[in-house]
Structures are given as structure tokens and as C-alpha cells.
């Protein structure tokens, strides 16, 4: 009395999950490649005195997320700006950049190509910690596929003192 899930790989169907608990209605299939489509089939079963009875299969195609952005770093930090750098995601159309401010994540930029791998956030306050996150996206036949977000933290530097401030200390 449960469910069996099969994944089509290597030219054949392989059982990847089985439960005898009919209240379990989801599972996670691991070791899949990013930005790939897979065929799955699911069927219910019931154990009887005469053996196991199976329902018909329900088939579905699933698409995995894009690979996460790799190598995200906050570099070129100044008193009022942070430069974000990351590695190219070969499958991406572009990248979405967000900043955490006011208690929520706010989109601050979207790149429209896969070759822009830096973004400088300007107009920041001195000596202040900030959080940024980046995810890749891919436009694919009218649908958009996303990676998960990757987060980086950085603190802006203390600005320079005005020259009259330094001379007033003497």
C-alpha cells in the first residue's frame, strides 16, 4: 500500500523511490544534472494475499534547475560601493542581482547576457555590512529556468577624513 517512482536513465526505467506509507506523496531524486529534462513514472501498489497489485503509471517530465552561480565574491570594496564578481554559468541567459535592505530582498539589476560577470553596487553607506545574492536564469522556449540564489556579505570601508579634520588634530 504505497507508491513506486521510476526514472528513465541509461535506456531503461530504474526504480529510485518506493514507500509502503500511502501518506507519503513526495520524494527527492538525487544525482541529476543541472538544466536537464528527465522522464519519471509513478504508480501506486497494494500488497494482497495473491501478490502485489499495481495501478497504471502516471508519467511526467521534469526539468532540473540551472547550476548555481559559482565563485561569487565581493571585491573592490570602497566606502560607498561593492563590486560583485562571479564565474560564467555556461547554460545561463543572464543573472539576477539582489540586495537585502529594509528587511527584504530587492532586485537591483538583471543582466541580459551571459558575459556580464560583474556588477558594482554604488551609493552605499560607509562602514556598513551588506548582503547580496545572485542567481542565474535561462530563457528556454518561452519558459524561464532559474538556479538557486548564492549569497555573499561585505562591509563598506570607512571613508577618508577631510584634510581640514586632520590639520585640526595638530
Regions found by a protein language model. Name each.
Residues 29-48, 121-141:
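Beta-strand-rich modules
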Residues 34, 51-91, 126, 142-170:
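Pro/Thr/Ser/Gly-rich low-complexity, intrinsically disordered linker/stalk tracts
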Residues 18-19, 28-31, 47-49, 64, ...:
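Tandem-repeat/low-complexity and Cys-motif detector
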Residues 21-26, 76-83, 113-118:
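Ser/Thr- and Asn-enriched, surface-exposed coil loops between beta-strands
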Residues 1-18, 24, 41, 57, ...:
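Extracellular low-complexity, O-glycosylation-prone stalks/linkers
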Residues 4, 36, 46, 76-83, ...:
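Short stretches within intrinsically disordered, low-complexity N-terminal or propeptide regions
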